């Protein structure tokens, strides 16, 4: 609906022009006007402003279903290759929906929970029964490491090159443009 798209643009314009960092009455009023006109229930749940530092680029991606949108900021260079990498990171996040940026951000309680799940799976696996305890511990550690790599953005295999992680791709792009990203 063109009215809905126009409202989205107007909401963005007002948010940036007035420096809003949370949903304001003005947002609600604008929504109510259109909701009344098109008879749809709409709301803005939150407003987030992403500031891009001087030596950085940003990219956005909105999936074709208009339900998934991603913003990425890459610091260190404004080179076109970095802009493309930022866009590719957006595609990656939309496709793989990482839960965390890095493994440092994963709560210990989550790791403990997953450890218990893997221990339970291993206890029910007949092949594991005959293995020595140190081998079981190594397998458990490997399962946890693999799982963390799957849920952490920087450790995931890159969407456009599944032979390297996001971190490795970032290093490759950084080297190509002569910058630490």
Task: Describe the residue ranges of each PLM region.
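N-terminal assembly/interaction segments in proteins that build large macromolecular machines
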Residues: 1-181
């Amino acid at each position: 609906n063109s009215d809905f798209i126009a409202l989205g643009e107007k909401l963005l314009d007002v948010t940036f022009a007035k420096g809003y960092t949370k949903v304001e009455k003005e947002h609600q009023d604008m929504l109510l006007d259109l909701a009344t006109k098109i008879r749809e229930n709409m709301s803005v749940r939150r407003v987030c402003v992403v500031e891009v530092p001087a030596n950085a680029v940003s990219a956005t991606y909105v999936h074709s279903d208009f339900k998934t949108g991603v913003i990425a900021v890459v610091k260190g260079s404004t080179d076109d290759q970095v802009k493309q990498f930022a866009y590719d990171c957006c595609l990656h996040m939309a496709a793989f929906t990482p839960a965390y940026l890095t493994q440092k951000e994963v709560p210990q309680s989550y790791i403990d929970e997953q450890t218990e799940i893997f221990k339970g799976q291993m206890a029910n696996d007949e092949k594991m029964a005959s293995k020595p305890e140190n081998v079981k511990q190594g397998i458990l550690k490997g399962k946890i490491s693999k799982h963390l790599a799957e849920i952490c953005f920087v450790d995931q295999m890159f969407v456009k090159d599944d032979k390297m992680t996001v971190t490795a791709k970032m290093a490759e792009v950084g080297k190509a443009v002569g910058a630490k990203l």
